[in-house]
Amino acid sequence: MDEGSAGFTMTSIALSEAVDKAAAPFESVAVSRGKRLSTSIASGVRAHADAAAVAQVVELLLDNATRYASEGSVIELSLRAASRGQGKGAAELVVSNAVDELPEGDLDRLFDRFYRADVSRSSKTGGSGVGLSVVRAIAEAHGGSASVCGHGNQITFTVRF
């Protein structure tokens, strides 16, 4: 165990189990918000990470998705082992969903602290615009990254640990 960036306690964790546990409550949240959560979590994925921080990333991404995904849509969460190159292990967490309106020119700004693609949404959906900036900060503190891409009406967030 070692003390990582930003005070995280980094240990070897069963990432598959941590992601599954953090995602489980969002199945009912998604249903209550008129959506459905579908998960594809590879078994046996491990990472050198802070378990509480990983759970926070999953919770922030799924809270965001359940708030902003199109009514009746499926939110897809997946976790798989990946490679950072030179044999160094990594994991990739992906959350993807349909949205009513994709903020085309604003995608890169979604990770900016306090940024909101549509300021009128705060009164409808809540939130303060900090969640995705926290996701990126946690990913980077773990030596990884967080990115977003959009195609058509589909938005996909990818976090690498």
Predicted regions: what they are:
Residues T9-A14, V31, R36-R46, A82:
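Conserved catalytic submotifs in the C-terminal HATPase_c
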Residues K35, G143-G144:
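Conserved glycine-rich
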Residues V54-A55:
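A residue-level detector for a conserved hydrophobic packing site
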Residues A65-T66:
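Short helix-loop "hinge" at the ATP-lid/N-box region of the Bergerat-fold HATPase_c
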Residues G72-G89:
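Short beta-strand/loop element within the Bergerat-fold HATPase_c
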Residues L102-R116:
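Short conserved segment of the HATPase_c
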Residues G131, V135:
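Short alpha-helical Gxxx[C/S/T] motif in the catalytic ATP-binding
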